From Swiss-Prot:
Gene3D superfamilies: Classic Zinc Finger, Homeodomain-like. The gene is ADNP. Residues 393-433 have a biased composition (Low complexity). The modification Asymmetric dimethylarginine is found at residue 348. The modification Phosphoserine is found at residues 98, 409, 413, 608, 709, 736, 738, 805, 876, 878, 886, 889, 921, 953, 955, 1071. One of its GO terms (cellular component) is RNA polymerase II transcription regulator complex. Pfam families: ADNP_N, Homeodomain. Residues 354-361 are annotated as: Neuroprotective peptide (NAP). It comes from the Eukaryota. This is Activity-dependent neuroprotector homeobox protein.
Length: 1102
């Protein structure tokens, strides 16, 4: 634990297993060599047999399994798990060993490679990484006395927290993100960039001079694949990683961020040395004092690197520049002693690598900035500037270092300076007598000219570059870039931090927008040409704190210098339509930010690129920072709608970190700035606001629409009807100052069929069973229902969707396999009295006749009619035999048949029966004369269609014949009781339904005093006919397409009539078996009963 950090841990861990094996072999050889020497001390067999491990010690090695050595750095102490990455180890510990997660998990030290649990790591940091306290108080009384003496002074603790970035792979750390990123490029990605690097000493750089370019030794290298010539080795490595390998996310993942306790810095004193101190040395003594009192606590080697970048150019010339003029302490170490500067006088000053950051901002030590000869404050007005019209610039030595410069004589006129500086000169008197400008942006930002290598204040630099180098000023807008500080910006599309040197290339990927017409360009040259042609007379708006400037030199044709001014997103001057603005300022009543500025900016529409164009009208492709999906449409609307619908968050600003982040739309909880999409998923599982009504913000934004809709469906219909008025209102509200209340469509709440609350902690099978219950209630869930179920049950959406899909497929397979039938428990007679929209077939449409004859067995009648239509010449003989048998049995009535003697075999479908019903009085007279012989005829006629249909089921079905048959005799074309006439009247037969009347009067015979056997036979016949009717419903073409030569002759029935009762019972048993009806086609009864007009079937539609 208390050892110094060991390097090359990977190599040591790989060799450790081999070392253990070698040591074990050496020990085994030693034991074999000395076994003879210790034999005299060996006990006898009695003690060996009666001694166990428990007699020696409590630990039995035979009960434990020898665990293999784990070469990965993060090893779990409770199980054999090990991982190379700390994130995987942490996830394993959280999921498997969550009972004591905080105290048992290994944590990595942010300063070195030491890993330990929480308590041990705290001790480790206190011993090895504790800051040096400056002067701790001896006792509490002295501390109180000190506070009493310094009561008027501001309280300062001995130490403060400093935010630093650190490399997760080594001990390197730095307060600047860019420095740590460059370190990773140089130290940890050499193997990635090595195949792409090529030496090109004979090739020179292109004419473009990038920002801060230096004459370094790496300038002779270039990329093999695309011939990219970088300004440094780190730039080439970044180019390879970003453009060719596309593994930039790995670099981002290797950079960590933490807060370090460092001692509070003392005021920095940069006293000019005496003239006799001029001598050549590697490091001036002043830098040593700077390292001890700097704001950041850095290792000595890193501080030297920061203050002397680049290393090769820190020579005697650079040191001499530190001590050429007597200077006193100022914010930048610059203050005059004499009356003024002569024209030829030169003044040199040594600054840190990034002077505005490394030098502390002590406003009490700042008195004047670049004063004139009479000691007057350097005002921004032209009157104060007149006595010292000097341009102060710091020129770097050898055109290489940003940290050293020379103060030169000026050539800038008074009018040129007042043009740029006059923006802040409205109150010159207040500027002269007011507080010192130590905290203003103009005193904190210096820029170096990339062409003449001179250092300027930022407000003077833009005018210098435009006038001296004939630079063309090109304005642009990139509202997706948030400027963090001078060296780092954040892309709101990609949710990535970008350094200054790669920011322009990244913005060109998304596109820069014209501030006047909102055209998007991915090339600076095309944008500059667009400005020259279209907006040549337009005036530039005032420069804000969020403006980024880039100096470029184009090589097309002649050298063209371009000063690109990009207006980025800033919360302070964001328009009212900004989503992040509303997230940061979210009182119940929407505020009106900057009303005066907006009114002035709306009059000259093209003068201000930031305020004139509303933020929400940026039209283009938007990239979601959470799921990286491409969104099309207005940037603000599309991104806000996507975040709300897909991720259920809205943009806001973190109240502590002051960074752009998101908050939950259900519970209004704010996520941290380094959250991901998986963080939202985990939160939604346990969010208490999910499923409740929308939050108060949505109710205030759209109170009328939410009150109008009591249920889900009216909301959608109401919104569709109000779509065009709402669009019109949006357009009117965009022009006004107040923010629009109709900015977002309110999200309709999801109503679940079953409440999944309480099932998230159940087992996997229990949650699946809940989904099955939900499927029985709602088999077709919507997308949002699936998302809500996934969030509530802690399941993947794909699992839930596949579960519902499998259930639906199983239902379909079961329906096809088991052929389920739906029993309609309707009283059809009563149903016909009611007006309804149900459409029944002609078979089930009954007329309201008397109670006794309301139910007519239509299928039995159809069977008789089918038996009557025979094709062969023997059919007439069969009818004669039937008449003879009926006469012998004593039947008093004779059925009359008119049969066409010759029927064509080609068209058996044309053989259609024509029914001529008799009067009701005649049928009643015949009912009284019925005897036993007629019942046998009834039994035989009942049996006959069953056999015929059993034979007809073997034939193939012809769909065309069915259609033609239905067209010939459609039941819907005739009224109730009308005569059905087919299209082929030539092949028809006519008969009088005397026998049918006999069949329809079986109910009276059942009530009469007949034998029990006859009653039983009649009841079984009715059940048989009903079963045949249900099984043969829907198709009749199998019967009608049967060749008439295959139909059975009536002579075959003569023998059956001799013993009708036995054969009828056998046929009844066969029909009850049901197997023969499974092969029968459906739909026989519909067309067949439709042709029977005299059986009290109604063809009217209900």
């Amino acid at each position: 634990m208390f050892q110094l950090p060991v390097n090359n841990l990977g190599s040591l861990r790989k060799a450790r297993k081999t070392v253990k094996k070698i040591l074990s072999d050496i020990g085994l050889e030693y034991c074999k060599e000395h076994i003879e020497d210790f034999k005299q001390f060996e006990p006898n067999d009695f003690y060996l047999k009666n001694t166990t491990w428990e007699d020696v010690g409590l630990w039995d090695p035979s009960l434990t399994k020898n665990q293999d050595y784990r070469t990965k750095p993060f090893c779990c102490s409770a199980c054999p798990f090990s991982s190379k990455f700390f994130s995987a180890y942490k996830s394993h510990f959280r999921n498997v060993h969550s009972e004591d997660f905080e105290n048992r998990i290994l944590l990595n030290c942010p300063y070195c490679t030491f890993n330990a649990d929480k308590k041990t790591l705290e001790t480790h940091i206190k011993i090895f990484h504790a800051p040096n306290a400056s002067a701790p108080s001896s006792s509490l009384s002295t501390f109180k006395d000190k506070n009493k003496n310094d009561g008027l002074k501001p309280k300062q603790a001995d130490s403060v927290e400093q935010a630093v970035y650190y490399c997760k792979k080594c001990t390197y750390r730095d307060p600047l993100y860019e420095i740590v990123r460059k370190h990773i490029y140089r130290e940890h990605f050499q193997h990635v960039a090595a195949p792409y690097i090529a030496k090109a000493g004979e090739k020179s750089l292109n004419g473009a001079v990038p920002l801060g370019s230096n004459a370094r030794e790496e300038s002779s290298i270039h990329c093999k694949r695309c011939l990219f010539m970088p300004k440094s080795y780190e730039a080439l490595v970044q180019h390879v990683i970003e453009d060719h390998e596309r593994i930039g996310y790995q670099v981002t993942a290797m950079i960590g961020h933490t807060n370090v306790v460092v001692p509070r810095s003392k005021p920095l004193m940069l006293i000019a040395p005496k003239p006799q101190d001029k001598k050549s040395m590697g490091l001036p003594p002043r830098i040593g004092s700077l390292a001890s009192g700097n704001v950041r606590s850095l290792p000595s080697q890193q501080m030297v690197n920061r203050l002397s970048i680049p290393k090769p150019n820190l020579n005697s010339t650079g040191v001499n520049m530190m001590s050429s003029v007597h200077l006193q302490q100022n914010n930048y170490g610059v203050k005059s002693v004499g009356q003024g500067y002569s024209v030829g006088q030169s003044m040199r000053l040594g600054l840190g690598g990034n002077a505005p950051v490394s030098i502390p901002q002590q406003s009490q030590s700042v008195k004047q900035l670049l004063p004139s000869g009479n000691g007057r404050s350097y005002g921004l007005g032209s009157e104060q500037r007149s006595q010292a019209p000097a341009r102060y610039s710091l020129q770097s030595a050898n055109a290489s270092s940003l940290s050293s410069g020379q103060l030169k004589s000026p050539s800038l006129s008074q009018s040129q300076a007042s043009r740029v500086l006059g923006q802040s000169s409205s109150k010159p008197a207040a500027a002269a007598t007011g507080p010192p400008p130590g905290n203003t942006s103009s005193t904190q930002k210096w820029k170096i000219c990339t062409i003449c290598n001179e250092l300027f204040p930022e407000n003077v630099y833009s005018v210098h570059f435009e006038k001296e180098h004939k630079a063309e000023k090109v304005p642009a807008v990139a509202n997706y870039i948030m400027k963090i500080h001078n060296f780092t910006s954040k892309c709101l599309y990609c949710n990535r931090y970008l350094p200054t040197d790669t920011l322009l290339n990244h913005m060109l990927i998304h596109g820069l927008s014209c501030p006047y017409c909102r055209s998007t360009f991915n090339d600076v040259e095309k944008m500059a040409a667009h400005m020259r042609m279209v907006h040549i007379d337009e005036e530039m708006g005032p420069k804000t704190d969020s403006t980024l400037s880039f100096d470029l030199t184009l090589q097309q044709g002649s050298h063209t210098n371009i000063h690109l001014l990009v207006t980025t997103y800033n919360l302070r001057d964001a328009p009212a339509e900004s989503v992040a603005y509303h997230a940061q300022n979210n009182p119940p009543v929407p505020p009106k930010p900057q009303p005066k500025v907006q009114e002035k900016a709306d009059i000259p529409v093209k003068s201000s690129p930031q305020a004139a164009v509303p933020y929400k009208k940026d039209v283009g492709k938007t990239l979601c920072p959470l799921c990286f999906s491409i969104l099309k449409g207005p940037i603000s609307d599309a991104l806000a709608h996507h975040l709300r619908e897909r991720h259920q968050v809205i943009q806001t600003v973190h109240p502590v970190e002051k960074k752009l982040t998101y908050k939950c739309i259900h519970c209004l909880g704010v996520y941290t700035s380094n959250m991901t999409a998986s963080t939202i998923t985990l939160h939604l599982v346990h969010c208490r606001g999910v499923g409740k009504t929308q939050n108060g913000q949505d109710k205030t934004n759209a109170p009328s629409r939410l009150n109008q809709s009591p249920s889900l469906a009216p909301v959608k219909r109401t919104y569709e009807q109000m779509e065009f008025p709402l669009l019109k209102k949006r357009k009117l509200d965009d022009d006004s100052d107040s923010p629009s209340f109709f900015e977002e469509k309110p999200e309709e709440p999801v109503v679940l069929a079953l409440d999944p609350k309480g099932h998230e902690d159940d087992s996997y099978e229990a949650r699946k069973s809940f989904l099955t219950k939900y499927f029985n209630k709602q088999p077709y869930p919507t997308r949002r229902e699936i998302e809500k179920l996934a969030a509530s049950l802690w399941l993947w959406k794909s699992d839930i969707a596949s579960h519902f899909s499998n259930k639906r497929k199983k239902c379909v397979r079961d329906c096809e396999k088991y052929k389920p039938g739906v029993l309609l428990g309707f009283n059809m007679k009563e149903l016909n009295k009611v007006k309804h929209e149900m459409d029944f077939d002609a078979e089930w449409l009954f007329e309201n006749h008397d109670e006794k004859d309301s139910r007519v067995n239509a299928s039995k009648t159809a069977d008789k009619k089918l038996n009557l239509g025979k094709e062969d010449d023997s059919s007439s003989d069969s009818f004669e035999n039937l008449e003879e048998e009926s006469n012998e049995s004593g039947s008093p009535f004779d059925p009359v048949f008119e049969v066409e003697p010759k029927i064509s075999n080609d068209n058996p479908e044309e053989h259609v029966l024509k029914v001529i019903p008799e009067d009701a009085s005649e049928s009643e007279e015949k009912l009284d004369q019925k005897e036993d012989g007629s019942k046998y005829e009834t039994i035989h006629l009942t049996e006959e269609p069953t056999k015929l249909m059993h034979n007809a089921s073997d034939s193939e079905v012809d769909q065309d014949d069915v259609v033609e048959w239905k067209d010939g005799a459609s039941p819907s074309e005739s009224g109730p009781g009308s005569q059905q006439v087919s299209d082929f009247e030539d092949n028809t037969c006519e008969m009088k339904p005397g026998t049918w009347s006999d069949e329809s009067s079986q109910s009276e015979d059942a009530r009469s005093s007949k034998p029990a056997a006859k009653k039983k036979a009649t009841m079984q016949g009715d059940r048989e006919q009903l079963k045949w009717k249900n099984s043969s419903y829907g198709k009749v073409e199998g019967f009608w397409s049967k060749d008439q030569s295959q139909w059975k002759n009536a002579s075959e029935n003569d023998e059956r009539l001799s013993n009708p009762q036995i054969e009828w019972q056998n046929s009844t048993i066969d029909s009850e078996d049901g197997e023969q009806f499974d092969n029968m086609t459906d739909g026989v009864a519909e067309p067949m009963h439709g042709s029977l007009a005299g059986v009290k079937l109604s063809s009217q539609q209900a």
